[in-house]
Amino acid sequence: MASNPHRSGAGGSLYGGAAPYRSREGLSTRNAAGSEEIQLRIDPMHSDLDDEITGLHGQVRQLKNIAQEIGSEAKFQRDFLDELQMTLIRAQAGVKNNIRKLNMSIIRSGNNHIMHVVLFALLVFFVLYIWSKMFKR
């Protein structure tokens, strides 16, 4: 018995009696005479496949356009974030510079502030002492 990959047992099909590779109405296959090639025949009655293919081409075109728009939006967002990051780095450098200047200014004039606070406290205690003496009589 010759070996045919599409037949098994008593001449029955592996596909339960259906022609192999049959996917929908209007499509049928048959083996070419004496070869392993398969011929596909489309019934003219079911010619809506061309319309479906055209519709699929349209959907593919739409998906391609959407993918391109997503790519351009991603590039725009990446450029925006890069620019924002550079602005943030410049702002951080400016803040660090100003804090450094402020710290140096505090260190230079810090002793005078402490002296002023001490003198103010002594003055307040002196005024309170004098006031308490005046109203004690």
Curated annotation (Swiss-Prot):
Positions in the Cytoplasmic compartment: 1-113
Compartment(s) where it occurs, according to its Swiss-Prot or TrEMBL record: Golgi apparatus membrane; Endoplasmic reticulum membrane
UniProt topological domain (Vesicular) ranges: 135-137
InterPro entries: T_SNARE_dom (IPR000727)
Membrane topology qualifier: Single-pass type IV membrane protein
One Gene Ontology term, aspect cellular component: Golgi membrane
Similarity comment text for this entry: Belongs to the BET1 family.
Official protein name in the record: Bet1-like protein At4g14600
Source organism per UniProt: Arabidopsis thaliana (Mouse-ear cress)
Lineage: Eukaryota, Viridiplantae, Streptophyta, Embryophyta, Tracheophyta
